[in-house]
């Protein structure tokens, strides 16, 4: 699931220990969609959900829930930036250090989220994991993913990503976590390296001629994937089961 994974990557990048934020693995929706008995019942809503215990908020008698991945990361990030409630003080700021850098991070975050949202109809109409086979619709929607990637590509024309590689001590932003999660999701779960454009000149969704090539986005992806935070822990349920992978990687003819 893409949205819980971005939070997992964020927690690793931030160095937030499991003693402060415990990841609770729920059962498959077809098998109860429930949390283990030692934890509170799974609240309603799509995952991830951050359950804040009553003790963390004076006057509250019940759990407080945050039900959106970006909101969860922002909440935790502010706790770390302020060193509140026992959270480790941020070693670097993941949402920018001044008004301009914060605006840039929001720009990238919006496009990364747009990619993830646009992918839903691509996989729904174009793969065996979907509920309705409409290859033409899936093919059209993937062009909107390319539109967002093309914009990001233009922003990064002069950027060097070597510092993001494991051991190079480079830091990532929250928006970069979200973008990497999308690129990782399409590659590892759907077998599509979305950064590999055709290299051909095509018309985008607005009828403009563009070169379908995302060299800098690919450089970013290759650098980030070497980081410890990007690993997938099969024992923790971060790798889809074989049956699900088979459906996700079964593409209708003509989509790709």
Residue ranges and their predicted role:
Residues 1-11, 176-177, 188, 227:
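Short, thiol/selenol-centered motifs that function as redox-active sites or metal-ligating centers
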Residues 2-139:
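GST-like domain detector, emphasizing the conserved glutathione-binding G-site
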Residues 8, 194-198, 236:
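Structured alpha-helical bundle/scaffold domains in large eukaryotic membrane-trafficking regulators
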Residues 25, 231-243:
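Acidic carboxylate-rich catalytic motifs and surrounding loops in phosphoryl-/glycosyl-chemistry enzymes
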Residues 82-85, 232, 245-256:
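Eukaryotic N-terminal low-complexity, Ser/Thr- and Lys/Arg-rich leader segments
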Residues 85-96, 163-166, 232-236:
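Short, hydrophobic secondary-structure boundary micro-motifs
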Residues 97-105, 240-254:
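Amphipathic alpha-helical surface "interface" segments used
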Residues 100, 104-226:
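GST-like fold's C-terminal all-alpha helical module
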């Amino acid at each position: 699931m893409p949205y819980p994974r971005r939070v997992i990557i964020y927690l690793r990048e931030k160095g937030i220990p499991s003693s402060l934020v415990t990841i609770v693995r729920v059962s498959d929706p077809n098998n109860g969609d429930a949390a283990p008995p030692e934890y509170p019942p799974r609240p309603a809503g799509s995952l991830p959900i951050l359950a804040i215990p009553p003790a963390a908020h004076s006057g509250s008698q019940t759990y407080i829930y945050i039900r959106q991945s970006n909101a969860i990361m922002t909440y935790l990030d502010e706790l770390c930036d302020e060193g509140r409630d026992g959270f480790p003080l941020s070693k670097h700021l993941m949402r920018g250090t001044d008004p301009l850098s914060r605006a840039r991070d929001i720009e990238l975050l919006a496009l990364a989220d747009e990619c993830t949202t646009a992918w839903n109809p691509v996989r729904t109409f174009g793969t065996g994991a979907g509920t309705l086979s409409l290859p033409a619709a899936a093919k059209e929607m993937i062009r909107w993913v390319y539109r967002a990637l093309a914009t990001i590509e233009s922003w990064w024309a002069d950027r060097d990503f070597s510092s993001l590689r494991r051991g190079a001590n480079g830091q990532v932003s929250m928006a970069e976590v979200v973008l990497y999660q999308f690129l990782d999701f399409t590659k590892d779960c759907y077998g599509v390296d979305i950064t590999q454009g055709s290299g051909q000149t095509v018309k985008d969704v607005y009828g403009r001629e563009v070169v379908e090539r995302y060299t800098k986005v690919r450089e970013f992806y290759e650098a980030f994937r070497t980081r410890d935070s990007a690993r997938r822990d099969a024992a923790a349920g971060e790798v889809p089961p074989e049956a699900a992978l088979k459906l996700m990687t079964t593409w209708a003819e003509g989509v790709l």
